[in-house]
Regions:
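N-proximal low-complexity "stem/linker" segments adjacent to membrane-targeting elements
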Residues: 1-30
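Conserved catalytic core of nucleotide-sugar-dependent glycosyltransferases
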Residues: 108-188
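Short beta-strand-to-loop acidic/aromatic patch adjacent to the donor-nucleotide binding site
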Residues: 96-106
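Active-site acidic short loop of glycosyltransferases
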Residues: 93-96, 185
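Active-site-proximal specificity loops/subdomain of glycosyltransferases
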Residues: 50-92
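Short beta-strand/loop segment that forms part of the nucleotide-sugar
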Residues: 36-49, 71-75
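Cell-envelope/extracellular polymer assembly enzymes that use nucleotide-activated donors
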Residues: 6-10, 38, 199
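C-terminal catalytic/acceptor-binding lobe
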Residues: 20-23, 167, 189-268
């Protein structure tokens, strides 16, 4: 077990397809089997598929306890407000490091440990644990592929079922929790699928925080996409308009903008 005990992985989920269910099981298993850490999963949906479909499988396949804090919010809304859900988990976490973690992402163990140490001991505020550019393995998973991977965590299994693609700013970020909060957390004015990944990186760099990056690959387990995870999101135009507006701000205007966001009052 790798010691990441002063970190909390925050994972927002809505299990809207069988491949997303498989990904949640795969990534949760990977984290629990390899790291001594803390995990919060917040699920927003009509019913909890994590409890009914994922948890029984995890209990069956894991050699360790399912040490996950699962929070379920019942909702019939078609909107999965990922940004709000993340903020609620940032607020819930009580460790010095918070990891915004996409349920479809797998990172090499060495990258996870290095990102953690860069914040804990290296003076970084934010770390992107993968490179910029062609550092993404887009994995086309099947039940057999992920089962083989979970047997011994051999990344070659994922590589052999993938294509290399662009990586920039999404999936996983390690944050000093105090900095995440000080810098405005997730922008809840973005709704569902949005340029929030670009904005987050842009913002924390513009505000002068020490943002680091690790030149290694990330594995993204592909999945079906609905309106909450693709450009068909009905809020896409307003999301893009907000992103354009933020890019026109000076550092001082950006600080002023985030100091006046009403959603932040919930977390004080």
């Amino acid at each position: 077990m790798i010691d990441l005990s002063n970190a909390t992985f925050i994972i927002p989920i809505r299990i809207e397809s069988d491949d997303r269910l498989r990904n949640v099981i795969t990534t949760t298993s990977y984290l629990l089997e390899n790291f001594d850490t803390n995990i919060i999963i917040k699920e927003v949906d009509k019913t909890s598929r994590f409890v009914s479909d994922a948890l029984p499988v995890l209990k069956n396949i894991l050699s360790v306890p399912v040490k996950v804090k699962h929070i379920f919010e019942e909702s019939n809304s078609p909107l999965f407000h990922r940004q709000r859900v993340l903020n609620e988990m940032i607020h819930e976490a009580d460790t010095d490091i918070v990891v915004n973690y996409d349920c479809d992402a797998i990172l090499p163990i060495d990258s996870m440990k290095k990102a953690y140490d860069m914040i804990k001991d290296g003076g970084y505020d934010v770390v992107y644990p993968y490179g910029w550019g062609n550092y993404q393995y887009q994995v086309k998973p099947s039940d057999d592929v992920v089962s083989d991977f979970l047997e011994n965590y051999d990344y070659a299994i994922l590589k052999s079922n993938s294509t290399i693609y662009d990586a920039q700013s999404g999936w996983v970020q390690f944050f000093k929790r105090s900095v995440y909060i000080e810098g405005g957390m997730e922008n809840e004015n973005f709704k569902a699928y949005a340029p929030e990944d670009k904005e987050r990186l842009y913002r924390y760099q513009k505000l002068g925080y020490n943002v680091g990056r690790i030149s290694n690959f990330i594995y993204h387990l592909e999945h079906a996409r609905g309106q909450n995870s693709w450009f068909t999101n009905p809020h896409m135009q307003s999301n893009n308009d907000l992103w354009e507006e933020i890019q026109r701000m000076t550092k001082e205007q950006l600080i002023e903008y985030y100091s006046n966001q009403s959603y932040l009052q919930k977390y004080l």
